[in-house]
Regions:
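Glycine-/small-residue-rich active-site loops that bind phosphorylated ligands and cofactors
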Residues: 14, 80, 112
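The conserved cystathionine-beta-synthase
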Residues: 16-33, 40, 81-99, 106
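Compositionally biased, intrinsically disordered low-complexity regions enriched in proline and serine
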Residues: 15, 103, 139-141
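A glycine-centered beta-loop-beta connector
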Residues: 29-32, 37-54, 95, 103-118
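Short acidic/glycine-rich loop or secondary-structure boundary segments that cap or lie
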Residues: 24, 46, 58
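Tandem CBS (Bateman) regulatory domains
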Residues: 1-11, 51-81, 85-96, 117-142
Length: 142
């Protein structure tokens, strides 16, 4: 089974600086084709995350001006994190229990990546395919 570290090796990590406008952040999400971005301060410390869901629930539904509103004012600050050595199943359980689609991955107190529920489900599908192949070969081996 693939590990969290292996999944992250194939992914880029993008961040946005604190103080950015919602408009700039949304443009960045669209440009990078991502659904969530960590918001960092000048030292690289993660202050929160901004997601498509934050845009809908905290900006659009409240008729806030995306050109004037700072992402810091509407980002999610209560973060659910995973450590790099956690199993994919542990990450999936955290995501399910907290009803989130992305989880930040930390190694030695440093942000090293983001895992999405899609990443974990694709991993589960691959594992199931491998199990089916092994069982098929066992059952139909000559």
């Amino acid at each position: 089974m693939e590990t969290i570290k292996q999944i992250l090796n194939s992914k880029s990590l993008y961040t946005i600086k604190s103080g950015s406008t919602v408009k700039d952040t949304v443009n960045f999400l669209a440009e990078k084709n991502i659904g969530l971005v960590p918001i960092i301060d000048n030292t690289g410390k993660v202050l929160g995350v901004f997601s498509e869901r934050d845009l809908v629930k905290r900006v659009i539904s409240k008729d806030l001006d995306i050109y004037l509103t700072k992402v810091d004012d509407v980002m999610t600050k209560d973060l659910i994190i995973a450590k790099i050595d956690e199993s994919p199943q542990e990450c999936l359980t955290k995501m399910k229990n907290n009803k989130i689609r992305h989880i930040l991955v930390i190694d030695n107190e440093k942000l090293v990546g983001i895992i999405s529920i899609k990443d974990l489900l694709e991993l589960n599908i691959q594992d199931m395919k491998e199990t089916i192949e092994v069982l098929h070969n066992y059952i139909y081996a000559r």
